[in-house]
From Swiss-Prot:
Stated name of the protein: N-acetyl-gamma-glutamyl-phosphate reductase
Pathway connected to this protein: Amino-acid biosynthesis; L-arginine biosynthesis; N(2)-acetyl-L-ornithine from L-glutamate: step 3/4
Family: Belongs to the NAGSA dehydrogenase family. Type 2 subfamily.
UniProt keyword Cytoplasm present: yes
One biological process term in Gene Ontology: L-arginine biosynthetic process
Function per UniProt: Catalyzes the NADPH-dependent reduction of N-acetyl-5-glutamyl phosphate to yield N-acetyl-L-glutamate 5-semialdehyde.
Principal place of residence: cytoplasm
Lineage: superkingdom: Bacteria
UniProt-annotated catalytic positions: C117
Pfam family name, one: Semialdhyde_dh
Length: 310
């Protein structure tokens, strides 16, 4: 019998993307409730407890409520896409390529917290350098990023696409998170193995899906003898054998005139680049992904598949 999957919040941006990725699959059975009943707590609780895996695509408080609904039912496993549990040590962090053991941790976990879109890129760049001893304690990490506006959910999509919206956004590109207290900073710090929080400057562009995350570094402040080439080698070694996260060869990066934020739109992969001048004193690390792909729904389905295969 096919395992039962319930997407709680299936009518939101992330939930709809998960349903699209699972359309036509015969190896799972999707449980569903009508959109009009999405706030029916009794019906939600029944569906949650009927599932083998519940995928929560909800705001933080609603996710916490849903977890309470299944806490006594050990037959239900949970993938949560909110920020509620991403630094909770009782939950497996759902970035399978984060280190060599992470995929197995996800596969065997009852509770999996899906990573945020920005942290997926930032951690993907930072953690390998911390693990390799290249990025020292106390380094003042800066993360700059631009996301497609779909990351803001239905409200921001309406603001960006409907010029008659009462709070329409007409800017082609804008910064936000200006007080430097973005909700993704804690998971960047914890899962990036950082001993101090990074300065994180997020922004949104006038494109629906796509993301660029940048981490600029001064080589003189890294481990002695660090070069652009040794950083690239550390990333290559960390992701050896991976298909979803790939490191672009230095020669290919050098040939680029620009990085297109929407290159991976609709894909569930991530590309990592190392830019700089050979022999120079600075490098810029770049992660390219779809904010709704590897940054959200694609990762959730990947985690589901790992859990089902265990």
């Amino acid at each position: 019998m096919a395992p039962k999957i319930f997407i709680d919040g299936e009518h939101g941006t992330t939930g709809l993307q998960i349903r699209t990725r699972m359309a036509g699959r015969r190896d799972v059975e999707l449980l569903s409730i009508p959109e009009a009943e999405r706030r029916n707590a009794a019906m939600r609780e029944d569906m949650l407890n009927s599932a083998d895996i519940a995928m929560l695509c909800l705001p933080d408080d609603a996710s916490k409520e849903a977890v309470q609904m299944v806490s006594a039912n050990n037959n239900v496993r949970v993938i949560d896409t909110s920020t509620a549990f991403r630094v909770n040590p009782g939950w497996a962090y759902g970035f399978a390529e984060m280190d060599k053991e992470q995929a197995e941790k996800i596969a065997s976990a009852r509770f999996v917290s899906n990573p945020g879109c920005y942290p997926t890129g930032a951690i993907g760049l930072i953690r390998p350098l911390r693990a390799a001893g290249i990025l020292p304690d106390g380094y003042p990490v800066t993360v700059n990023a631009v996301s497609g506006y779909s990351g803001g959910g239905k409200q921001m999509i309406a603001q960006m696409e409907n010029p008659d919206h009462p709070d329409a956004i007409t800017a082609p590109h804008f910064l936000y998170g200006l007080p430097l207290t973005h909700k993704h900073v804690p998971e960047m710090t914890v899962h990036g193995l950082l001993d101090r929080a990074p300065i994180f400057s997020p922004s949104v562009g006038k494109f629906a899906q796509g993301m660029i995350v940048q981490v600029p570094l001064h080589l003189d402040d890294l481990a002695e003898g660090t070069t652009m080439e040794s950083i690239h080698a550390a990333l290559v070694a960390h992701y050896a054998g991976q298909e979803i996260v790939t490191v672009v060869p230095l020669s290919d990066s050098k040939a680029l005139a620009r990085v297109n934020a929407v290159e991976l739109e609709g894909k569930d992969t991530m590309k990592l680049f190392v830019f700089g001048t050979p022999g120079g004193s600075q490098v810029n690390l770049v992660a390219l992904l779809d904010n709704l792909g590897k940054g959200a729904s694609g990762a959730a389905v990947q985690n589901m598949d790992l859990m089902l295969a265990s």
